[in-house]
Each structure stands twice: as C-alpha cells, then as structure tokens.
Design a protein with these regions (language model features):
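Short, Lys/Arg-enriched N-terminal segments with co-localized hydrophobic residues
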Residues: 1-11
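N-terminal intrinsically disordered, cationic/polar leader segments
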Residues: 11-88, 92-161, 165-192
Length: 192
C-alpha cells in the first residue's frame, strides 16, 4: 500500500514547479525560443524547445509544460534548473577547484593556456575557452591546485572533467587529479 502511495505522488515535477526569483541587478528576456539572462558578471542565452512555456511575472519566473507526457515532464525540470543556474552564474558565478596529488605533479598557466605535468613523459597543454578564468595555486609543501571560474556552470564542469580525465585518481594511493573535497574510494593493497 505504501509503494502505491509513493508511486502516485510523483505526478508533479518537484523541481519544475518551483518558481525562480530574480535577484536585484539581473535582467531576464524571452524572445521567440531563446531566453537571455544578463547580470553584473556577464550574459547567457539558452534555446527552449518542445513547447515549454516560460513566464516572467514581476521578477518571478515560472516554467510550465503543455502536457503530462514523459518527455514534457523531463524537460520541465531541466529548463527550470538551467534557468536557475544561468541566474546564479551571471549574479555570483560558478567555480570548481581541482587538486593535483602526486610527486612531481605541477600546474601553471599563461593566460588561457594550462600546462600540466602529471607524470607522463611530456607535459599536457590545454587551450581553455576564453569564458573560463584559470588560476593555478602552488604553495610549498602542499598539493598544487587549479581554480576554474565562469558564469556558465556547464562549461566550468566540462573543463574540470576534461582536466580530471587526464589522470583520474587511482584507488590504491589516491594519486591523480581530483576535485577539492572529493572523497575517493580506497582499496587495500596486496597483503604479503
């Protein structure tokens, strides 16, 4: 009986039905199928598809779906989350921090070019998108860190994931590129 109640209670989108309030200094425009959000840190645009209706009523943005089809339910929550991320991005910005754990692992940047020494025979050089600001932190006695900041949450996440993919943390010693605060699943080595 309990399972039936829980199953029937999922008819409404938990994320999509929550309205998004615009903070002071952020403007929101809807034209055709494109929404544009402008703030003190920059401007972001997103194309809206599949008949999802977006309304801006006195600084409160609501997202509505035309039907209860599976696709419309999925897009309902998606577009609400994207709009919320855009508003936070142009107002406060998004950041990710990576930590390089390993002997001889180093990171340096010159503008948008990131140079990584991750224990390979050659350094890895990455040309990062101009929308992402890179900061490398190297303190004596501590692991080097890379801080990425941008107004676009998706872009920051994609760049951070690409950097991490060059040397993912291994489970035995924990060496590699990891997110700051990431908890790694560790394994015990061979017992003699």
């Amino acid at each position: 009986m309990l399972c039936l109640l829980i199953k029937n209670n999922r008819k409404m989108s938990r994320i999509g039905n929550n309205p998004v309030t615009l903070p002071a200094g952020v403007t929101f425009e809807i034209s055709e199928n494109v929404i544009t959000v402008k703030g003190k840190l920059g401007e972001l645009s997103q194309e809206i598809k599949d008949g999802i209706v977006i309304k801006n009523e006195e600084g409160v943005i609501s997202v509505e779906r035309p039907s209860n089809s599976k696709d419309h339910k999925a897009k309902h929550g998606l577009y609400r989350a994207l709009i919320n991320n855009m508003i936070i991005g142009v107002n406060e910005g998004w950041s990710k921090e990576l930590e390089l754990v390993g002997v001889g692992y180093r990171a340096s940047n010159q503008g948008q070019i990131l140079d990584l020494a991750l224990g390979f025979s050659h350094n890895i050089v990455i040309d990062v998108a101009p929308e992402v600001k890179i900061e490398t932190i190297s303190e004596k006695g501590r692991n080097p860190k890379i801080k990425l900041t941008s107004v676009d949450k998706q872009l920051v996440g994609a760049v951070a994931a690409k950097i991490r993919s060059f040397r993912k943390p291994e489970p035995y010693k924990g060496k590699g590129v990891k997110y700051v605060g990431e908890v790694l699943r560790r394994k015990a080595g061979k017992s003699a």
